[in-house]
């Protein structure tokens, strides 16, 4: 089925964007710019909390971002710093765009005539296209959607690809729909949204994570209740709602990965995924090695069994027999080596409800796991050992634990955090319950 693919965003919004760009350029011309690295370092040092102890750890950069375009943030659920060096924040009002100083530039609140709503994830690819996982209404002949009075009126999960935000000429380049862009259901009777055993339907599926590769191919995670015969999955050819999906850079469906089990947790599973992470990120580089490995956060609903490991790390290996998806034995093995550090990514029961993952695309290679169940941010080195590098001159090379958090509104606390990002030594957290974007930096990164 070919669904309509809207291509434009309202002209009035473009006028506002153009006006803002001129105004901001004028301010820099009259007042000068404070974006040079030396000045930023001085400001960062002056904005840290002086009462914190002088140990290795993350310190807050004040003030936190609380204002989006046209008003305060309302339950921000994700944050991403793009290749264009803008900060993207998704909340109940849409996607806000801020500069690196936290100054709001504009708000994308409507896409092709509908509100931009129920956002779950945002990310930018190397072409500067922005992906937004959200929901959209549509009418489908022959559908059975139970959310409203008309079964042909459906509320479905989508992933928007929006081009031209950086140049001031935004347009919707593509929309990935569930279930229309799931290749396992094309040209079958399951292509149309339907209702399944127990009253669940395609309206219960949601896209939870979006990640890009260096060549702009796309990984998407999806979750929902239809995953086995017992829960209404009609055949093995029909991809489960809990799935890891692959798309080309142009949005063509490639496959869903059958090697990742959908209905039981394991080291190779897509069991109620909440996010997906690849090992590429800003800033822009002339050449980037193509690494297809990925990590998935697992966060089942309270009615389902908890996974032993809340995060899985998967290696993609090309063999003479084709592509294989293997458990990341290196990071898994780190958990069995207590001499390597005081904690590891693969520790049983470590995470309660991991909601977001981030990767430091620099020489550190740090991995960040945001756990809304513990209101905490966990930090690991690239080998999967909990902690960060010790400061120069330290008597030991063991990573130093730097994870932090706790429930509350304090500078090192969170309330149901949903998104984490990293850019140039700064960690950004979408602190949902506190309606803010918190920022942190390692105290050893201040020169």
Where do the language-model regions lie?
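Beta-strand-rich domains and repeat architectures in extracellular enzymes and scaffolds
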Residues: 65-93
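Conserved beta-propeller blade signature
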Residues: 86-88, 129-132, 217-220, 289, ...
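Blade-level signature of beta-propeller repeat domains, shared across WD40, Kelch, NHL, RCC1
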Residues: 414-447
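A short helix->beta-strand "capping" segment at the edge of beta-propeller domains
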Residues: 34-74
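Short loop/turn segments immediately following the C-termini of beta-strands
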Residues: 34, 84, 90-92, 134-137, ...
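Short loop/turn segments immediately following beta-strands, especially the blade-tip
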Residues: 162-177, 245-254, 311-332, 380-394, ...
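C-terminal motif of bacterial Sec signal peptides marking the signal peptidase cleavage site
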Residues: 22-26
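Beta-rich, blade/repeat-based domains predominating
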Residues: 71-82, 113-125, 193-213, 262-290, ...
């Amino acid at each position: 089925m070919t669904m309509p693919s809207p291509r434009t965003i309202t002209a009035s919004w473009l006028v506002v964007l153009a006006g803002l760009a001129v105004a901001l350029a004028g301010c820099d011309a009259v007042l000068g710019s404070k974006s040079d690295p030396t000045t930023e370092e001085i400001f960062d040092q002056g904005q840290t909390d002086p009462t914190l102890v002088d140990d290795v750890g993350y310190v807050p950069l004040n003030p936190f971002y609380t204002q989006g375009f046209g008003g305060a943030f309302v339950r921000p659920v994700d944050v991403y710093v793009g290749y264009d060096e803008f900060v993207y924040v998704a909340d109940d009002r849409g996607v806000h765009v801020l500069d690196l100083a936290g100054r709001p530039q504009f708000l994308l609140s409507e896409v092709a005539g509908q509100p931009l709503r129920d956002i779950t994830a945002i990310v930018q690819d190397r072409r500067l296209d922005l992906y937004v996982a959200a929901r959209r209404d549509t009418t489908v002949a022959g559908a059975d959607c139970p959310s409203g009075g008309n079964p042909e009126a459906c509320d479905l999960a989508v992933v928007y690809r929006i081009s031209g935000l950086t140049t001031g000429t935004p347009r919707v380049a593509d929309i990935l729909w569930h279930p229309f862009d799931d290749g396992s259901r094309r040209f079958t009777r399951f292509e149309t949204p339907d209702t399944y055993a127990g009253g669940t339907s395609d309206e219960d599926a949601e896209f939870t994570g979006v990640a890009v590769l260096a060549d702009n191919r796309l990984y998407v995670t999806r979750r929902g209740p239809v995953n086995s015969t017992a829960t209404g999955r009609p055949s093995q050819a029909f991809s489960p709602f809990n799935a890891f999906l692959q798309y080309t850079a142009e949005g063509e469906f490639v496959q869903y990965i059958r090697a990742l089990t959908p209905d039981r947790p394991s080291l190779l599973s897509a069991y109620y995924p909440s996010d997906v992470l690849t090992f590429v990120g800003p800033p822009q580089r002339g050449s980037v090695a193509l690494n297809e490995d990925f990590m998935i956060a697992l966060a089942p609903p309270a009615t389902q069994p908890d996974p032993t490991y809340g995060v899985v790390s998967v290696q993609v290996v090309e063999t003479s027999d084709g592509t294989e998806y293997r458990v990341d034995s290196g990071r898994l093995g780190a958990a069995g080596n207590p001499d390597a550090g005081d904690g590891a990514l693969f520790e049983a029961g470590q995470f309660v409800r991991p909601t977001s993952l981030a990767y430091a695309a620099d020489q550190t290679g740090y991995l960040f796991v945001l756990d809304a169940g513990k209101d905490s941010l966990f930090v690991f080195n690239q080998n999967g050992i909990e902690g960060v590098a010790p400061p120069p001159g330290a008597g030991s090379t063991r990573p130093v634990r730097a994870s932090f958090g706790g429930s509350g509104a304090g500078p090192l606390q969170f309330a149901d955090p949903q998104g984490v990002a990293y850019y140039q030594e700064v960690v950004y957290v979408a602190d949902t319950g506190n309606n803010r974007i918190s920022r942190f930096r390692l105290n050893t990164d201040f020169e």
